[in-house]
Each structure stands twice: as C-alpha cells, then as structure tokens.
Amino acid sequence: MARILAFDIGISSIGWAFSENDELKDCGVRIFTKVENPKTGESLALPRRLARSARKRLARRKARLNHLKHLIANEFKLNYEDYQSFDESLAKAYKGSLISPYELRFRALNELLSKQDFARVILHIAKRRGYDDIKNSDDKEKGAILKAIKQNEEKLANYQSVGEYLYKEYFQKFKENSKEFTNVRNKKESYERCIAQSFLKDELKLIFKKQREFGFSFSKKFEEEVLSVAFYKRALKDFSHLVGNCSFFTDEKRAPKNSPLAFMFVALTRIINLLNNLKNTEGILYTKDDLNALLNEVLKNGTLTYKQTKKLLGLSDDYEFKGEKGTYFIEFKKYKEFIKALGEHNLSQDDLNEIAKDITLIKDEIKLKKALAKYDLNQNQIDSLSKLEFKDHLNISFKALKLVTPLMLEGKKYDEACNELNLKVAINEDKKDFLPAFNETYYKDEVTNPVVLRAIKEYRKVLNALLKKYGKVHKINIELAREVGKNHSQRAKIEKEQNENYKAKKDAELECEKLGLKINSKNILKLRLFKEQKEFCAYSGEKIKISDLQDEKMLEIDHIYPYSRSFDDSYMNKVLVFTKQNQEKLNQTPFEAFGNDSAKWQKIEVLAKNLPTKKQKRILDKNYKDKEQKNFKDRNLNDTRYIARLVLNYTKDYLDFLPLSDDENTKLNDTQKGSKVHVEAKSGMLTSALRHTWGFSAKDRNNHLHHAIDAVIIAYANNSIVKAFSDFKKEQESNSAELYAKKISELDYKNKRKFFEPFSGFRQKVLDKIDEIFVSKPERKKPSGALHEETFRKEEEFYQSYGGKEGVLKALELGKIRKVNGKIVKNGDMFRVDIFKHKKTNKFYAVPIYTMDFALKVLPNKAVARSKKGEIKDWILMDENYEFCFSLYKDSLILIQTKDMQEPEFVYYNAFTSSTVSLIVSKHDNKFETLSKNQKILFKNANEKEVIAKSIGIQNLKVFEKYIVSALGEVTKAEFRQREDFKK
C-alpha cells in the first residue's frame, strides 16, 4: 500500500510517474534546455565571461598606459593630450611618417633617441609586455606558450635584447616563397613569438641604461616608476572561501587533493583494494609488511609500476591484475613535482600538508612566496614550490584523514576504518515537506557543472509540484541517464554511439527484408551479431549460413553473463550462437560451461579476440563467481555512480517521507540485501530490460514521451517484480534444452511473463496514460547571450540588405542593426516579442525586443512591417489604436489557429522572424506519428525528427492566445498583465 514517485532524469528532460497502491495515477514529461553551447559544450555564460574579462583586461592596460603617459609627459615635458585618441582616431603623437617601434627599440641600444621616440619605445614595451604567470592557462595553450618561450629564450642568447631580436629576425622580412612580410607579433592561435616578461623588463632596463650613457637626462625616480607601472601585476584572488566542508566534520575544510596525506590515503585505498582482490580471486593472503612495502615505494618515488608490484608480492611477470592497463599501477605526477621541488628537508608531515594547502589556495605567486617563507625552506625551495600548480580537494578533511589512515595502514579498507571509528557522514535532521534548493544544502559544493545543476533544479521543481498536488510519499525511485555528469565530449561520444546503433539497426532492417526475415527486434539483433562475429558462432566457431538465420530454431542470442545472475541486458553482453551451444551453456558463463574443455576454450579465446573489448572481457572472464559475491548483479540493478548517489542522498537527507512499514529496514543501503529505503537509484539496464519484457517499443529519442514510459517502469521496478523477472529469466536459461525439445512457443513465454506484470492490462493502461500527457517546458524569460555579434562592419556592407545609405540609417533607427563605437554590428538574440492587436481590425502586430534593448533599458514601441528584400519600410508605432496582448519568450505556450485550420492548437513558441513577420512554433511532444488532420495543416513540413512549423504569419491568425503550463503539464490561460518595462 505504497505511494511511489519515480523520475527519469536526463540532462534536458525529466520523465515522472506517480503510483498509489499499485495504481498508476499520473505521469508526465518536463523538457528544458541544456545550459551550454550545443556545438562546443561550453557554458552559455562563457562568451559573456570572456568578453567581461577582456574588457577588464583592456581597461587595466589602458589605465596602466595612461599612467605611463602622465609620467612621460611630466618628465619629458611633452603634451599628454597628444598621446590620447578621441573617437577611435589616431592620437596626434602617432600621426605622420614614423619609424617602426621595433626599429626604435633596436636604435635605442646604439644611439640617443629623441624624447618622442623614447616615449614610443617605453609605451610599446609596456603595451606588449610578454608572458609572466601562465598557471591559469589551459594545458594545451600553456604547453604551446612554454615551448615558444623556451625556443625564443635560446635565440635571445645571441642578441642584446628582445627588441633587437625581433627587429633583426622578423621585421620587414619576407615569408618564404612569398611577397608577404613575416609577422613580428603573434596572430590568432599562434604562439611562435611568445616572450617571457622578464626579458622585456630586462630590455627596458637596458634601454634606460644605454640612453643615460648616450646623454639622455631623466631621474632615477622616473625610471623606477616606469618599470613599476609598466610591469605592475594585480594580486590574484584567494579561493579558500570556495573550499567545501568535510563529509564527516562539517566545521572542517576538505583536505587538498595534492597533499602528502591525501596521496597516502589514495595509495592505501588502491593497494588495499588490490590485495583484497588477490585474496578473493587467488586465495593469497598478504601481510601488513607487504602493504607497507608497496606504500613505501609510492611515497618514495610517487609511482608504482605493475612490474614492481608483482615483484614485491612475489607474483610472476606474466600475471595480469584485474584492470591492468599501461605501465603504472599508481602514478602521482603532482606528488613527484612536490618532492622534487622540496629536495632535502627536515619538515614535519603537518608542515608538508600545510605547504600543499598554501600552494592549492594561494594563486598569487608573491603572496605564496610570503606564505612559504614561514616554513623551514631555503630560497631555492620557495621559488620551486611557488611554481607548482595544485587544485582540487578530497571530500574529507585532514582531521578525518589522520583518523582513518592509521587503521588503513593495518590493512583495513576505508569503509571498515570508518565503521570502526564510528565516522558517519553528517546528515540533516531537519526534514522538510518540500525539497529545498540544492544550493541551500551541504551538497552544494559537490557539483559545479551547470548542466547537472540545471537537471537537479528541474527535478526539484517537478518533485515539489507533485508533493504539493498529491502530498507526501513513501518512496522515490530515480534513474539518471548515463550522460548526466558527463562532460560535453563524453556526451558527444555517447550520442555518436547511439546514432551508430540506430544506423546499424536500420541497416539490419533492410537486410531482414532482403533475406525474407520478419522485421522484429530479435531478428535485427541476430543480423547485427551475425556481422559483428564475422558469420561464426561465438562458442563453437562453426560458420553460420544464411539458411541458419532463416530457421528460427537454429540460432539463439545468448547472454554471456547469464541474465538471471547479472541483470546485464546490454548489447555488450550478447552473442549469437547455435541453439545446441546455448543448451549446453545453460545458466553459466562461457568459462563455467566450456572451461574444462581446453581445445574448445582455446577456440573461444581466438574467436573472442575479433569482438569488441567489453564483449571479449565478458567471454573470457574466469572469475565471475567472485563478482557475484561482490553484488555484481546489484550494481546492474542499482545505479552506483557518484552523481546518482548525490541526487539520492540530497533527496533522502532533506525530504520528509511517509513512514515505511515496521518490517522494513531503512538503515541498510539500497544496494544491501534486505534493504528497504525511501529513495533508490535504479539502473538504466534494469529499465531497458523491463521495457522490452513488458512489451513497450524501443525508444524513439525524437519523441519526448519515452521519458514518461521509463519513469513508469522505474516506479514499478520493486523487489518483488525484479525477483519474479529474475526467476523467469533463470527458468529460461536453466531449462533451455527441455523447452526447445518441447517446442514451447514465444507466445507461451509472453503469457508466462504476465505473472510478473504489476497489474492486469498494465501495458495498455500505461499507453493510455501516456496519451494524456502534455509535455511541459519552462518559459525562458531571462535575457541571455551577447548584446550584438562580435564582428564590426562598415556601413557599406549593409547597403544591399537595406537599400543603400538611407535604408541603413532607417535600420539603425528601428534597431534592426546597431552602431557601437562608430561601427555597425548585427543584433544579438531577440529574447522577447511583444504582441499587440489593432482595436478595429483585430490584426496582430509584433514588437521585437533584443538583448541590446534590455541592456540600454529602452523599450521599443514599433511593430515590424513586412518589406521586400533590399528595402526597408517604416515600422508601425503602437499608439492608442493598438492594445497590448502579451509578451512571448522562447518556449512560451500559445494557442493559435490559422485561416486554414478547423480548430486552434497548442504549440510552443520557438522564435520570431522579423523579415517575414512570422512565428516558428513546435508541437509539445515532438511526436510525428500522432499528428491529427488539423495539426498536419499547421505542421505541413513535419518529419520524424522534428515537428516544427515555420513562417506562421501573425496578422491574420483567427486565434492567438497565451497560456501557462505548469511543471506537471497542466495548462491554464495566462492572465492579462501590463506590458513590462525594463526600468521597473
């Protein structure tokens, strides 16, 4: 008699379901946008952040140069105004025929300069003052910069200064086989001319020295001030306030990941896990001395190879550890850098940890050196340590590490040490009826990925809406899509795999047609495996003929790890075999079934080498029983990923639930046998298997409704269902030979599986509920993106688009294009459209509003007038003859009816095209197959991938109304609101 909520959480979707007393009460879908650039995966805020950073950098440089200009003007008795530019024009001091500053920098070493030329040399060096601190550059850029700096440093050995080097090597030198000059400065994405700032500072000092020798008179104070201002560097911020708190001691900060104690903890964890695995698989018991021998090797050198590990443990060189890959078992690159920078020392462990902490938190080199000076370090050590780059923290503090590491040194695993010390993760005792915002919980520091944060935010929004509508529940089941928590490149790889999988299925469908096979999921999979296995049986090595594929009884799809023991229904756990081989294998792994037959096993090993690595490992696995003992099946049933546990704990720790029955144990983890918990994280593997078994079609990823089907399955994936399903699969595997002998049909199995359906008529009931869903989308009201395009253009470039100079002036007046710093740019995003209606004609008009309008706090009041290409009409002033209706934002829900439609339809607003005065709209569920006759009139160019209508003219719409959709998909008409002004 439980009330259960279930969620299928993706990076841009939430599927949800609510069941009460085993009855499906409600389900729905929420779709939202990923907060990232779809092409690059970069944050949507990145362009603004980079632009803001560039503005600040340029402003600082301008202030620095202005300061220098004042100093120079005062010292050299020059006019400061001559060095200032106005309205983007060239400053007076730089007009006329002038010698290149590179040539002047060379001459400065050999002859007396004029005051004006000396001023230009100082300003030129100060403007492009080289690279100093590149700690915060990304790894790829940093590597290129360092390489170029080193190469140029070697070349500089033959010259007095940087200026002389650049002048003689590159100035007015032709490119090879070209009439173009070589670049003296770096161009975009070029690092060849990168010079260390220290060399430029040395050059300016040398020029001051030489000019004084040549008779140029200036004060020592002036020289010192110029050098100080020209090479001034702002102190970097301290980020200590951003460090999260310890999982066990909430008043303690987390330990730096690159501290010696943290390295010891990580090394101990890996070594203990390795020794325990050897104990379980080989029955070998290792002592505390063995553990210490391995640990000492790591702490001495920062590395431990697999070869060293085998030698220290007395294993043969050809022994292969589980997961062995590459040379190193443990490699701590940062630890190696740390011990190298330290050299010989007499520092305590605590001091070393504090030093690592300072390096991690203090990003300003001068401040860091001051902090390091309080330790027993010489200047060389301080200089070396200050160059290190440390970041990131563990989840626990030094205090916790100092408690657990002594027990781990005795050979206890981390969780065993925590249990012995009674260390428990701090939990929230103040449970709420509604889930609080993630950033108000002690998990707030665990996630910084904006894509994941958006998914968690939308999950909370839907969850709280359901709790408000239906009240408290007993349980919440969640499934996180595998792309949640992945970075953009990882998600792109997943998407590529999905597309390849889709293509392979479509190709197999065509092949089925050619061979006269029924087009069903089973035959499609058989054909895919047939091709992957190069037309050979995975266990016998016999050639599979086309006639074998056409005979339903000849071949079977086998689960490499028996499904009833693994719950692994993935493609990588399936092979195509002759029925006879499957009958022999039964409910066993390949090694358990055929390992005693050495000749056959050798053949299987050879065959497996031609298969994907993941499949190969499963086939050749000799230790599956050990994995079973380690809850391997549970891990396939339950999602143990970090991000899944995080969402689970966030929900469990802060939400108040209805009490579970007395015989349910809520103290056990959801992966432990006999556990009964309020929140469970289900595996996508389980959902996929039940989806197939209960007769739901394969996912159509273009159709949003599949998220709700998954949520329903998650809601009913309880222990009793899973057990019944497991028993059913076990019977299939164990009695395979007998069943085939009796020719039991697939229909018999379909009837048998009904015994573990949640209730009678389950599939149809779910499909009926799915048909009732209106997909919810949040309206995107917040202005975002750049104010205008980056490229500045000449006025003439717009003449063709707007019909000459007068047209461009008109376009500027209407805000179609913008003038910034005397140049013209295209608009940024249109984030809002205000809809008006003529009081007499009832025709609709649209006033576009861009991010630039929002930034300028100027509300446009002219509606777009349609014009032909190459001309521009006056837009229409929305005066007293027009009435304001509503504002549209991206994903606003509207009800529209064109003149050809029989009735109005709900659609989501996507965009407005000012050139055609028309809307772009989309169907809520993006489902092509269910388009009604009326909808087909609207979405006449729809296809399976997208149901979108473009060029919907607004003036003559019969119905044009705005609606509000809740997080649960409940639709209500929007109340009238006064037009919103930016100034309010």
Swiss-Prot record:
GO MF assignments: DNA binding; endonuclease activity; metal ion binding; RNA binding
* Active-site residues from the entry: D8, H559
Paired cysteines (S-S): none
Give residue ranges for domain HNH Cas9-type.
Answer: 487-637
Instruction: Look up the record and name the cofactor or cofactors this protein needs.
Output: Mg(2+)
Q: Which PROSITE patterns does its entry note?
A: HNH_CAS9 (PS51749)
Annotated HAMAP family: Cas9
Q: What is the lineage of its organism?
A: Bacteria, Pseudomonadati, Campylobacterota, Epsilonproteobacteria, Campylobacterales
Quaternary arrangement and interactors, per the entry?
Answer: Monomer. Binds crRNA and tracrRNA.
Q: GO biological process annotations for this chain's record?
A: defense response to virus; maintenance of CRISPR repeat elements
The species is Campylobacter jejuni subsp. jejuni serotype O:2 (strain ATCC 700819 / NCTC 11168)
What Pfam families does this protein's entry cite? CjCas9_PI_CTD (PF22131), CjCas9_WED-like (PF22129), HNH_4 (PF13395), RuvC_III (PF18541)
What this protein is called in its record is: CRISPR-associated endonuclease Cas9
Q: How is it used?
A: The simplicity of the Cas9-gRNAs RNA-directed DNA endonuclease activity may be used to target and modify a DNA sequence of interest.
Q: Where on the tree of life does the source sit, at the highest rank?
A: Bacteria
Does the keyword Secreted belong to this entry? no
Keyword Nuclease tagged: yes
Positions contributing to Mg(2+) 2 binding: D8, E483, H707
- What is stated about domains? Has 2 endonuclease domains. The discontinuous RuvC-like domain cleaves the target DNA noncomplementary to crRNA while the HNH nuclease domain cleaves the target DNA complementary to crRNA.
General function of this protein: CRISPR (clustered regularly interspaced short palindromic repeat) is an adaptive immune system that provides protection against mobile genetic elements (viruses, transposable elements and conjugative plasmids). CRISPR clusters contain spacers, sequences complementary to antecedent mobile elements, and target invading nucleic acids. CRISPR clusters are transcribed and processed into CRISPR RNA (crRNA). In type II CRISPR systems correct processing of pre-crRNA requires a trans-encoded small RNA (tracrRNA), endogenous ribonuclease 3 (rnc) and this protein.
The residues the record assigns to binding Mg(2+) 1 are D8, E479, E483
Gene3D superfamilies from the UniProt entry: Ribonuclease H-like superfamily/Ribonuclease H
UniProt keyword list: Antiviral defense, DNA-binding, Endonuclease, Hydrolase, Magnesium, Manganese, Metal-binding, Nuclease, RNA-binding
Protein family according to the UniProt entry? Belongs to the CRISPR-associated protein Cas9 family. Subtype II-C subfamily.
